């Protein structure tokens, strides 16, 4: 259960000149989870057998959270004459978060129908408690100035302190500055643009923000007593008695501070034809420094892993475009209005610093593009055993019979020309036949909408999508691999008929008999996509999926009855409507599988997905709860 309450107060101290506002938010969470397990005995027979569960248990967990947020803001707008506009804002904010957890566990339910710790006889029990807290306080200001609403400048800054950092680096200063020029108000452009140019504004800005989104206590050496919660939950015995103990704490980083994101932006706002057409363009570059990540390697003799700290940096370049057109006309004597709006944006991010001396490809490295996928190149499918024997050695793929290639197997490309498939040491300097085959980051994202209205009939729709994105199904994507994952899995509908190779094994030289049908699925080998070092567990461009998509996010059709008709039945308004969401989706990957939702394929459900490292192209198994189709019919009555 979560309860939230917000209060706000605004004082207009000097009318239209000085205003003071304050707000206070309190959010409380109280959650309890009980888990009971009872004894059971498997039926033992010729078909089914199993291991009995000889013990019963009861577990109780409680979670208590309290969050407070408050701020005070003052705004001064002095009168500086007709052509000058100045606004000064200053404020203070505070956040405080406290979480407490408790867990009680015991074995031995005497009465399973009445679970209670007082009705248990087990010797094994444990009690645990924990929690965390953090606080943040900040001071901020913003100064806006405009001359003739033609030349604009703004300065803003934040000075924030967080309890998550040590005293020497607790505070961070994050300034921003921007300027704008409304060219359309210049007399010299008005004289030449006529009535077609409504607004033209150029913008430039540079600003920084801080990020403290890490767990608290990372800069402290923390220890806990192991075994103190239960007399049976310790392996240390002194004087014939079990006693609690603790361990040497992990190392703490030598640098711990705010992550800093600095963005440089230039943009343009354009309106034409009495504001019927508008266009906005932005070009930006973002630098993220002091990223919280793993630190430099330490000698193995030290006996401790490297602590995480502010050791990495990232750069992102991108652009955003949006256009809008709206107008109206007479159609069959009735007013017809319409509007069309479209947006397109893209960005790419690269690692500019990261501790990875060996260039290990299983983690981040300097120069890496976020989301890149390393894998094997392929050149179709082997048509015969003879062709497979002439290809590179497949001894690298140790998966049962897959010590060599056969007819119907993928034809991997030996990029380094050494006569065998390999991954080398999986480093930048020695990566064998691996190469970059794709990228899982969404690119060329877009949306566009249409709105029409005529004679009380309204129609609107919103489409959205991603123009470029790759996804490789990981080992446990059973809904993609089917029997190539495990023999007892279902055969997917895309793996039937001529979409799968058919192999004639009547001679030693096996031959694929349906190569003319261009089958997508190779010879079926159970666990080829699951077992360690199976040939399909390694990313390859044959099974790399194009996860771009287009989706109809919203469709609304409505009819508003004429006002005269409404008045005759005692109403001031009557409207019928239908709204549908996620009604249509198309993706190139649907040619091979329609078991996944491309919009959420990389987010994943923690109950199913084995997510590895998202930035490294390992997006897990794609088991995400899909975006549901919804249909809504409604009526609006106004009295």
State what each model feature region is.
Residues 44-45:
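Intrinsically disordered, compositionally biased low-complexity regions
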Residues 384-386, 437, 448, 594, ...:
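Aromatic-residue-lined binding/catalytic grooves and analogous aromatic/hydrophobic interfacial grooves
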Residues 218, 225-230, 328-440, 471, ...:
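Conserved small-residue
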Residues 341, 431-432, 442-456, 553-558, ...:
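Conserved SET/PR-domain catalytic core that frames the SAM/AdoMet-binding pocket
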Residues 1-37, 48-377, 535, 539-639:
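Extracellular/periplasmic, surface-exposed regions of secreted and cell-surface proteins
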Residues 437-474:
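Glycine-rich, aromatic-lined ligand/substrate-binding cores of catalytic
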Residues 162, 466-570, 574-575, 593:
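Extracytoplasmic gating/loop element in the C-terminal half of outer-membrane beta-barrel translocons
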